[in-house]
Each structure stands twice: as structure tokens, then as C-alpha cells.
Amino acid sequence: VDYAKAHIVTLWCAVIAKATRGVTKLLPKQMTPLQFRLLAQLTLPESERVLPMRAARLLVLKPADVDEAVGVLADRDLLRVCDDGCIELTRAGRERAARLTERLNAFFALCVDDLSEEERAVLADLLRRAFSMPGSCYARRPLAGEASEAFDARRGLAATAMLHYAVQTAVKKATSLSLTDFRFLLELYPKRRTAARMLRARDMVAFLRTGRAYVTTASVRLEEQGYLVRVPDERDARGILFKLTPQGMICVQEVAEDLYAVLVSMFGEAVEERVVQRALKHLLELEDAALDALAELPW
């Protein structure tokens, strides 16, 4: 993969991962994004009482995954299964969905409200391309034709889930690494024709938005697998720098090439347009600020 492609893949992976992290931080620990998406779908007038199979089609999810979510949410009294097999929200479920929707709407608003009109239009076009991709189940849904100036919880979650799944699947097909572990290696890949890129632990914490403990354990694991080496920092006696090995370079090159192909299949040549990259860079900055502000939001 060339340096320009590596930069594009790094940018997209960061945007997707940080949106996913924001969603995960705002949902209760015992609730998955899939479970919340089901609750949110059942709040809509056209689908407030539907069969699980219908809900799966509306959400573009596997029926087995929806059935599992139904069981969990029913046990928590957030939805009920009616005598005819349809599912609907309980009063507690409707209240929980409303509170969580308010939280997620606030997060996504922080991410997009300071974008320029041009940047909003660029991102709206990207989402329309992805949702209306030929052969995609999303193409039959209203999301494909909606203008996305109002990037709310429902649309934000649908986009985040779709993009995260596509990227994560491509990574897992090529390697046994998690998406976060792959991003660890991806950040170490040089984005210009310069010397090898080396980063400190604190740099990785900032780039990946993870804890220091993850960076420590992941670096040991990735070193044992032969993807990176830890070298002493000449400017800091106690510091350690991370650097890709030749095996790590090859891994990043192969997986990044696959990820780039996935992005092109969804967005076409737009992935290479400078205006798109500028919009994504600004979005990434706003995501970082939104993640920092989560603790200060008035719940």
C-alpha cells in the first residue's frame, strides 16, 4: 500500500473507532449498541410493534442476533413479547430509549455542529453513497435518501455500526488482530517517505483513545507476535518507543490494501478527494473534543 492510501485508511479507521468509542461510553455497560438500536427502532411509529424478523430486516441485522437481543431486553423488562410473537417496548423500555437517545444525540451533535456547511454536505454525500450502495440492504431503507444535516442517534448509530462492521470484518479476514490492535500497528506505519515511524506510549494513548494499561499489554502481545519491537528512547531514560518490524510492515500493508478496497467499494473515488479528507480531519478533531466533553454533559 502506498503512503497516500495508508494515510486515508488511518484517517477513516480513526473516525470510525472514535465514533464507536463515544457510543460505547454513553451506553450502560450491560447494553450493547445492537440492543440500543433495537430499542430505538421500536420507538418509531411504523415499527413500534413488529415481529423480530421484521425488526432484523429494518435494522439490517442477522435474525439470530435480534432474537438474542430480544431475550436479553425482555429479561430486563425493557420490551415484551406479545402472544402473536410481535415485540414492543414496555414503559420502562420507552423511558430508557428516550434517555439514551438524548445522550447519543448530544454526542453526535458535538461531533458535527461545528462543521462548515460544505463539510456537512460532503459527509452527507458519503453517507448517501454508503447507504444506497447497489445490493445493500440499506438501499431499501429511508436512510439512503435522507439528507443527513441532522446527524441524530439513529442515523449516527446506523452509520457507525455499518462502517465499523465493514472495517472490522476486513481486518479479521486478513489477520487474527482486533481492530484496535491493528490501529496500533497502523499508527506506526510511515505516512510519508521518511525514516521508520516510532511513537511513545503516551502518543498511542492519545491516538487510540485507550488507557495506558491497554497500550502496555497490547505492545507486549504484538511484540510477542513479531509485529513490533520496543526500543529505548534516547531522549528519555525511562521511555520506550514502539517500532514496526518487517513482519508488522507487511501485515499493515496487506490489511490496509484490503481496507482501502472496502472504502472504495462504499464511497468510490471520493475517498481520495482532498475535500473529503479535510472534512474527515475536522470531524476527527471534533470527535476528540466530544469524547473529552462527555463527562461534562448534563445527564
Give, region by region, the residue ranges found by the protein language model:
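Residues in the recognition helix of alpha-helical DNA-binding motifs
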Residues: 69, 126, 218
